[in-house]
Amino acid sequence: MSLVHPDTSNYPFRFAPFLRQEYSFSLDPDRPVCQYYNSKEGASSCPNGTLCPNKHVLPIFQNKIVCKHWLRGLCKKNDQCEYLHEYNLRKMPECVFFTKNGYCTQSPECQYLHIDPTSKVQQCEDYRMGFCPLGTACPCKHVKKIICPKYVTGFCPLGRDCDWEHPPFYVPNELSKIRIKRDDEINTKKLDEEKERRLNAIINGELVI
């Protein structure tokens, strides 16, 4: 048995069945799809219910990208998750670090997709200038620039269907409120804290002078 990678198969836990039933922990991601499961009737259509060792996959959740939380073992939705719970390199989420910086520190071991920026759909220049004659048939991307006044005030009932832009909110700059302390102030505070700790230790009998 290795100290770095010990064999724990002989040490079962009483809560292991609960984790397997509720969160599908320790289940083979390549296990077959249950032939008895009916998406319309739910888990009751399978005689094994939530204890079934096979997958219960809803049709509307197929052909999705891989769940990023499942990759880290943190997804709690089990088979009800709207993302894939399997290793599929073609359906992995896009690497945020690579998209933002143009490179990835985890490459080539990174599990996420590294998409070439030049392969993405380019922004439509006609739409950016104010009008695109092709409309929805345009092969380029139409980026909304007019900010939605309802969204800025707090809520837009149209959501993603709104014709105006919903920009992300930014945290106000707090640099003006930051006060820079001198080294002597920091050292004095540390000295006072040390004296207070020693005094409390003496009072509690933890330190004898």
UniProtKB/Swiss-Prot annotation:
A zinc finger (C3H1-type) spans 28-59, 61-88, 89-117, 118-145, 147-169. Signal peptide: none annotated. One of its GO terms (biological process) is mRNA processing. The keyword Zinc applies. It is found in: Nucleus. Its main location: nucleus. Keywords: Metal-binding, mRNA processing, Nucleus, Repeat, RNA-binding, Zinc, Zinc-finger. InterPro entries: CPSF4/Yth1, Znf_CCCH, Znf_CCCH_sf. GO terms for molecular function: RNA binding; zinc ion binding. GO terms for cellular component: cytosol; mRNA cleavage and polyadenylation specificity factor complex. Gene3D superfamilies: Zinc finger, CCCH-type. Component of the cleavage factor I (CF I) involved in pre-mRNA 3'-end processing. Belongs to the CPSF4/YTH1 family. This is mRNA 3'-end-processing protein YTH1. It comes from Eremothecium gossypii (strain ATCC 10895 / CBS 109.51 / FGSC 9923 / NRRL Y-1056) (Yeast).
